[in-house]
Regions:
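WD40/WD-repeat beta-propeller blade N-cap
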Residues: 98-105, 141-148, 184-190, 226-232, ...
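Loop/turn segments within WD40 beta-propeller blades
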Residues: 108-114, 151-157, 163, 194-200, ...
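Blade-level signature of beta-propeller repeat domains, shared across WD40, Kelch, NHL, RCC1
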Residues: 370-393
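WD40-repeat beta-propellers
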Residues: 126-130, 169-173, 193, 212-216, ...
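Intrinsically disordered terminal extensions that flank WD40 beta-propeller domains
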Residues: 1-101
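WD40/WD-repeat beta-propeller blade-loop signature
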Residues: 94, 104, 113, 137, ...
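A conserved positional marker within WD40/Gbeta-like beta-propeller blades
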Residues: 102, 125-127, 145, 159, ...
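Conserved strand-to-loop turn within each blade of WD40 beta-propeller repeats
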Residues: 119-123, 162-166, 205-209, 240, ...
Length: 393
């Protein structure tokens, strides 16, 4: 069922209360003008993240000498447009706040075309939003009777998949908002789902019942089931969708072969539960987020060396809330992002392993992050019931 909504993200330049993820993590304000210097028309380095004409005091005295580009000491026409970091996206403002959820937001994804996005969480609702303009919440998808733990669009964006604590996975028509299929078979919470990138529309799921299941949405029951013993918190396919990769509370990442119907190999290294998995766009590398406070990159190509962990990233944290903190790749693979319980948005450079951004703004755990498919925009979903979209360089 689809319901028209009137909720809006606050428009205009301001991001709402609290700073959102800004476009740069640099140092604080620079030094002010020298004593006695008249406030000139050129803005200093200590500018707000969001350029706003309203922030300029109306009683600015004219610059000494009344010169400059405009008469009477006024700044030249268009000077206010320069009053902040240069814009690098088509967002209405460098930071947009999306509020409308009534509970913790666990997951968020951009549509593959980049014009809309979906979010979901504890309130059992899936909200669809416009990325540009006022970021209107234009539709609500209702149908789950439990919290929605993970969302994924299929490759062409025609379908949206949602995994829920109501033990089901729903398949939605992303155009009409209708639920076209409900996949039943798990006996406990479904923590994760992931659709195949190509070929017949398959989807894999992982559950607290300790199983990993493969579904063909043209059929009613699961096509294959793998028994993992321990709760499964995250799943994904490999690039060719002939293997399912799973992570859970046994700390291991397991690769299941669909043709041979067996466990192919196990990747060990994490010292606590694996809460998020993400395959790189070209399919060679796997990203994992775990409760041992590390994010790791693994080589999942066939015939890779036995030690498949190639990089370890640190900075983000998990805590007693035990949220399923996810992770994601930028489209070109140059950056990764990981959820964190310390309320910051973490973005790392994959080559240098350096933290590029540690962005404040959220008042609760940051559960999932998503990179825009075409523009330098990052989306964050948090337990504070909000989402932020922010420009990054």
């Amino acid at each position: 069922m689809i319901e028209q909504q009137k909720r809006k993200a606050p428009g205009g330049p301001g991001p709402g209360p609290g700073p959102g993820p800004g476009p740069a993590p640099g140092p604080g304000p620079g030094p002010g003008p020298a004593p006695g210097a008249a406030p000139g028309p050129t803005p200093g380095p200590d500018l707000p993240l969001v350029p706003s004409a309203a922030k300029r005091p109306r009683h600015d005295p004219p610059a000494a000498g009344g010169g400059g580009g405009g008469g009477g000491g006024q700044p030249p026409a268009g000077a206010l447009l320069q009053s902040g970091p240069p814009r690098c996206s088509s967002l209405q403002a460098p930071i947009m706040l999306l509020s409308g959820h009534e509970g913790e937001v666990y997951c968020c994804k951009f549509h593959p075309n980049g014009n809309t996005l979906a979010s979901a969480g504890f309130d059992r609702l899936i909200l669809l939003w416009n990325v540009y303009g006022d970021c209107d919440n234009y539709a609500t998808l209702k149908g789950h009777s439990g919290a929605v733990m993970e969302l994924h669009y299929n490759t062409d964006g025609s379908m949206l998949f949602s995994a829920s604590t109501d033990k089901t996975v729903a398949v939605w028509d992303s155009e009409t908002g209708e639920r076209v299929k409900r996949l039943k078979g798990h006996t406990s919470f479904v923590n994760s789902c992931y659709p195949a990138r190509r070929g017949p529309q398959l989807v894999c799921t992982g559950s607290d019942d300790g199983t990993v299941k493969l579904w063909d949405i043209r059929k009613k029951a699961a096509v294959q089931t793998f028994q993992n013993t321990y709760q499964v918190l995250a799943v994904t396919f490999n690039d060719t969708s002939d293997q399912i990769i799973s992570g859970g509370i046994d700390n291991d990442i397991k690769v299941w072969d669909l043709r041979q119907n067996k466990l192919t190999y196990t990747m060990r290294g994490h010292a606590d539960s694996v809460t998020g998995l993400s395959l790189s766009s070209e399919g060679s590398y796997l990203l994992s987020n775990a409760m041992d406070n590390t994010v790791r990159i693994w080589d999942v190509r066939p015939f890779a060396p036995k030690e498949r962990c190639v990089k370890i990233f640190q900075g983000n944290v998990h805590n007693f809330e035990k949220n399923l903190l996810r992770c994601s790749w930028s489209p070109d693979g140059s950056k990764i992002a990981g959820g964190s319980a310390d309320r910051f948005v973490y973005v790392w450079d994959t080559t240098s392993r350096r933290i590029l951004y540690k962005l404040p703004g959220h008042a609760g755990s940051v559960n999932e992050l998503a990179f825009h498919p075409e523009e330098p925009i990052i989306l964050s979903a948090s337990s504070d019931k909000r989402l932020y979209m922010g420009e990054i360089q």
